[in-house]
């Protein structure tokens, strides 16, 4: 089993190191990740400039081959599968993200996008995030457990798993729940300021607070001390709307 590991926090982040070390118990691990933090990159590809790659060898990854890419998480997986990793990997695992990817966070997440790219290219994939920045060993434990399960019982071809783990010691986790995505309120206002020359500058504000966080959501599972696993589909077609949209178009004449 050859496992491609990537992330969006960068190749030197604590989370990807904990993940790659844990997954060596499951097979051969190859790390291909951004050379810096690319959080919020979503599913973007770099098209206007060439991608530059630095081979890091086996430094800091428990003997695993590793590469730093000057690009996005999606670039990393795309480049790894199509060029860098030979023979091809059998699975793609993204994370461990430094912070939650709950609800509509998945739209912006480079971690989820890396897993999605893996699935798009034909490989079983999962994204794993720690809802905090302390207990990476807990998230790594569940990542290894899920990878072992996927080796025996592969996922459906059109799905990835989005996994969120409470920032708790392993013995304080209550269990695992299968969840749906919750939802947040509209993001908070943009933060406006000035640079030293008096020119306006802007910072994207923090995400909105929880809106749909009821029972059955990923938000609720985390709040109650459970690992949340949400299956995400690659096909974004709103099948339930096809007939209604056709009828609406008929009304337009």
UniProtKB/Swiss-Prot annotation:
One of its GO terms (molecular function) is metal ion binding. Its main location: cytoplasm. It is an enzyme of class 3 (hydrolase). One of its GO terms (cellular component) is cytoplasm. Binds 1 divalent metal cation per subunit. Nucleotidase that shows phosphatase activity on nucleoside 5'-monophosphates. This is 5'-nucleotidase SurE.
